[in-house]
From Swiss-Prot:
<keyword id="KW-0496">Mitochondrion</keyword>
<dbReference type="InterPro" id="IPR024319">
    <property type="entry name" value="ATPase_expression_mit"/>
</dbReference>
<feature type="transit peptide" description="Mitochondrion">
    <location>
        <begin position="1"/>
        <end position="40"/>
    </location>
</feature>
<dbReference type="GO" id="GO:0005739">
    <property type="term" value="C:mitochondrion"/>
</dbReference>
<keyword id="KW-0809">Transit peptide</keyword>
<keyword id="KW-0810">Translation regulation</keyword>
<protein>
    <recommendedName>
        <fullName>ATPase expression protein 2, mitochondrial</fullName>
    </recommendedName>
</protein>
<dbReference type="Pfam" id="PF12921">
    <property type="entry name" value="ATP13"/>
</dbReference>
<dbReference type="GO" id="GO:0003723">
    <property type="term" value="F:RNA binding"/>
</dbReference>
<keyword id="KW-0694">RNA-binding</keyword>
<dbReference type="GO" id="GO:0006417">
    <property type="term" value="P:regulation of translation"/>
</dbReference>
<comment type="function">
    <text>Required for translation of the mitochondrial OLI1 transcript coding for the mitochondrial ATP synthase subunit 9.</text>
</comment>
<comment type="subunit">
    <text>Binds to the 5'UTR of the OLI1 mRNA.</text>
</comment>
<comment type="similarity">
    <text>Belongs to the AEP2 family.</text>
</comment>
Length: 580
């Protein structure tokens, strides 16, 4: 069919027709596979690789340039042959970035702009396209940026090894990227020349990376870079970008809950002020900046007004979650309650269970419920109102999925709210533990192992001496612990050993030796650990017997001293009586 059409056209129009046809088919196929959206206005609804790979494919078609790492062979396949994810069909099969190349590029971050640009070109040639290039295009740098982000943990380790600043490397990379963005527009009327969807996504990717590093100042500069060039990106119904709004709420409206200072009642001592802790302080996957404050409260209300009207924004889980946290940080709990009622029809006034309610936004998720819990606790310093609303969500939205982060935050907050003087057995925390077990049992699921959750429950067990709680925790998490140990998770393994030793110590001290043997048999997990626990148990039993022996001997000694003292008093009495 194509041949017949080509024959009918004169030779000078064949190439034009072929190019037009191939572009049309390519774009159509990309849309069918979910790689290219029907409209590229809604920037952040689709992932960055949607725009990067889509733009790269079309660019290859138009200028006849084929990257050695781009595989576009699946464009004209039938739908039946494409059962995998859309990205798999266009995934870049690039060479992994080796350590030597990474060290060279990271070391160059301390050089001037030209030397750093040359190192980036060398890195691109080593990992993406072996064709030498003096200057990388913006598309090349965008593709390389995504590849570097996927290997950011390896890059961070290399930075530690060579004593280089990881954050400075990324900020130098952003400076180079911003320079190319400006050069693309020939530095003409930059404030009125908007960034395209891919450039916005790249900038937001770097903001996300700097937030993870706790480099909020650098993240603010990149956010300003976006806002200066796209001033309507926050409040325009047509051009609003979800990722940019989320980062604006996080950086300027207080929606970074891990930074919030929460009062810890469990560590309060009589006559002293309550200790203030941050929720993310024990999290090793992110770093926290030393300072954090919200700066823009007026724009928050405008964003909320837009979000409650636009369906696209209401369907964004990330946006609603950060919006809730912003209201919580601002202390506007009444506005927060009205927003929850407007979006999900959940009110502090309990609805009858038979009432059918419909949500106007996305279906509630763990991220949203965590934001609600943390926001109310931040203002109330107790969990009463947050748990009441949570109970309504679970009742009216039975399909809500509660992940490990939700339970981690619930145990953290319940632990912080626990006052030992009023509740010596921490019944509020134990109640949350039973709630978690009941939820997983109702869904016929096994709880996933989370280090922070295990640590919180271990602290409660140790402070209250509630070793049955520890045994129950190990019993519930046993399948997940066995799987995690097979993956050689060091932190989880260490906290499990603490559980085991604490429980064995309590059982030995109470003289329940048969229970100790049964515990080791059930929760030894492997031969080496069982051997170590038996040795620890034997040592504890030896110490206990030695302590008991010393206690008996001391008791006998005290009894002997008491009898000798009584005999001396009796002799003195007889002497005094005879003299009298």
């Amino acid at each position: 069919m194509w041949i017949n059409r080509l024959v009918k056209h004169p030779s000078y129009s064949v190439l034009r027709f072929y190019t037009k046809r191939l572009c049309t088919v390519s774009v159509k196929s990309l849309r069918e596979f979910g790689v290219l959206p029907n409209s590229t206005i809604c920037h952040s609804v689709y992932p960055r690789r949607t725009y990067v790979m889509g733009r790269a494919v079309i660019n290859d078609i138009l200028i006849k340039k084929s990257y050695s790492t781009h595989t576009v062979c699946a464009i004209d396949r039938s739908k039946d042959e494409n059962n995998g994810s859309a990205y798999d069909k266009f995934e870049a099969k690039g060479i992994p970035i080796d350590v030597h190349t990474l060290k060279r590029i990271i070391s160059s971050s301390g050089m001037d702009e030209s030397e750093f640009s040359k190192s980036i070109s060398y890195l691109f040639a080593k990992t993406v396209d072996p064709e030498p290039k003096d200057v990388l295009s913006l598309e090349d740098l965008s593709f390389l940026l995504s590849k570097l982000y996927t290997q950011r943990f390896q890059i961070r380790r290399i930075c530690r090894d060579i004593n280089a600043k990881y954050s400075e490397f990324w900020f130098k990379l952003f400076s180079l990227y911003a320079e190319k963005v400006d050069a693309k527009r020939n530095q003409v009327n930059l404030r009125n020349t908007k960034l395209d969807a891919c450039e916005i996504f790249d900038a937001n990717l770097m903001i996300k990376n700097f937030i993870e590093l706790g480099q909020l100042g650098k993240a603010q500069k990149i956010l300003s870079f976006i806002l200066d060039r796209n001033p309507d990106i926050l409040l325009s119904p047509k051009n609003a970008d979800i990722s940019t709004i989320v980062h604006f709420l996080q950086l300027r409206c207080g929606a970074l809950a891990p930074y919030w200072k929460i009062p810890d009642n469990s560590e309060q001592k009589q006559g002293f002020l309550r200790k203030m802790v941050r929720l993310g302080a024990k999290n090793t996957s992110i770093r926290l900046s030393s300072t954090y404050k919200a700066m823009d409260h007026q724009t928050l209300l405008k964003i909320a007004d837009l979000a409650l009207q636009e369906k696209k924004l209401l369907n964004s889980e990330d946006l609603l979650s950060t919006l809730i946290q912003s209201f919580g940080h601002l202390g506007q709990t009444q506005i927060l309650e009205r927003c929850i009622e407007h979006i999900w029809q959940i009110s502090p006034q309990e609805f009858p269970s038979h009432v059918v309610i419909k949500h106007r936004g996305c279906y509630p998720s763990s991220k949203i419920l965590v934001s609600i819990l943390v926001s109310f606790y931040f203002n109330d310093h107790d969990l009463h109102r947050g748990l009441s609303i949570l109970d309504s969500f679970i009742k009216h939205y039975p399909d809500v999925k509660l992940d490990a982060l939700f339970w981690r935050r619930l145990f953290q907050l319940s632990h912080f709210a626990w006052t030992p003087a009023n509740d010596k057995k921490a019944t509020s925390v134990v109640r949350c533990w039973h709630l978690m077990k009941q939820w997983y049992a109702s869904k016929r699921l096994r709880p996933s192992v989370d280090y922070e959750t295990l640590r919180q429950l271990y602290d409660i067990m140790k402070k209250t001496g509630n070793f049955p709680l520890g045994i129950d925790v190990l019993r519930s998490f046993k399948p997940g612990i066995e799987r995690t140990r097979a993956e050689n998770a060091g932190k989880v393994n260490n906290i499990i050993i603490k559980y085991q030793k604490c429980i064995i110590k309590e059982l030995v001290n109470r003289g329940r030796f048969s229970a100790v043997r049964e515990f080791i048999d059930n929760y030894g997990f492997d031969r080496k650990m069982t051997k170590d626990l038996n040795i620890f148990c034997a040592n504890r039993m030896f110490l206990r017997s030695k302590k008991m022996k010393n206690k008996i001997e001391n008791k006998k000694e005290r009894e002997k001293v008491r009898l000798d003292s009584f005999d001396d008093d009796e002799d003195d009495g007889m002497i005094i009586g005879s003299l009298w």
